[in-house]
From Swiss-Prot:
Disulfide partners: none
Name of the protein this chain belongs to: Large ribosomal subunit protein uL22
Self-association state and partner proteins as the record states: Part of the 50S ribosomal subunit.
Keywords: Ribonucleoprotein, Ribosomal protein, RNA-binding, rRNA-binding
Entry keyword rRNA-binding: yes
Any one biological process term the GO annotation gives: translation
Keyword rRNA-binding: yes
């Protein structure tokens, strides 16, 4: 049974967030957490927070099942574009430049591995 966590209206451009999302797509949760902890991208903090929320949601939906992070994997992760705030910046000769402050929505779905690898 899968679990989902959504982070809405994150004040980061979707392009920057997709770079971090691509790092953990399809990976086991314990490996994804290690990758995010060692990432230098600012968006990795938001992805880590949402991933922890998805794991907690999985534990909440399956109270009789004890599952470790090694048995869960990131089934799907995607970033959608959120609202864009449009601002103006004064420019030379009486003009104005438009600044687009972008935001995004992050969705993470985790599931249990069908055949866990035993060491």
């Amino acid at each position: 049974m899968e679990a989902k966590a959504i982070l809405r209206d994150t004040p980061t451009s979707p392009r920057k967030m997709r770079l971090v999302a691509g790092l953990v797509r399809g990976k086991p949760v314990d490996l994804a957490k290690a990758i995010l902890l060692n990432s230098t991208k600012a968006a990795s903090r938001n992805v880590m927070m949402t991933l922890k929320s998805a794991v907690a949601n999985y534990a909440q939906r399956n109270p009789d099942e004890r599952v470790s992070d090694q048995e869960l994997f990131v089934k799907t992760i995607f970033v959608d574009e959120g609202t864009t705030l449009k601002r103006t910046l004064p420019a030379p000769m009486g003009r104005a430049f438009r600044i687009r402050k972008r935001s995004n929505h992050l969705t993470i779905v985790i599931d249990k591995v069908k055949n866990p690898v035993t060491k």
